[in-house]
Design a protein with these regions (language model features):
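Short S/T/G/P-rich N-terminal loop/turn motif that feeds into the first structured element of a domain
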Residues: 1-68, 86-92
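Outer-membrane beta-barrel domain signature
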Residues: 70-79, 83-84
Length: 92
């Protein structure tokens, strides 16, 4: 399984983020989730919001990453104006 996850430095505007989430749900071969970060073990969390896609395997991730839908999500995320960090993980 492969996950692509995004950590946002601040919480995006809810209505604007729902528009973004609609784009994210269109990425083929993936399950999309998102939510507000509410805490950390010690002190305030560094990130305020997260999103993730889950793909069955590396081939599914690579295929999805080449789609117009996936590319549109990156462009749209940048247009929201909230700083974010993208990471990829292979889950055993």
């Amino acid at each position: 399984m492969v996950r692509a996850f995004v950590l946002y430095e601040s919480e995006p505007d809810a209505a604007r983020y729902e528009q973004h989430a609609e784009l994210c749900r269109k990425v083929p071969g993936s399950t999309f989730r998102h939510g507000r970060v509410f805490g950390a073990p010690m002190g305030e969390p560094k990130f305020k919001y997260y999103a993730e896609w889950e793909f069955a395997d590396m081939d599914a991730f690579k295929a999805a990453a080449r789609t117009d839908e996936f590319m549109a999500t990156g462009k749209d995320a940048m247009e929201m104006g909230v700083p974010f960090h993208v990471h990829f993980a292979q889950v055993d």
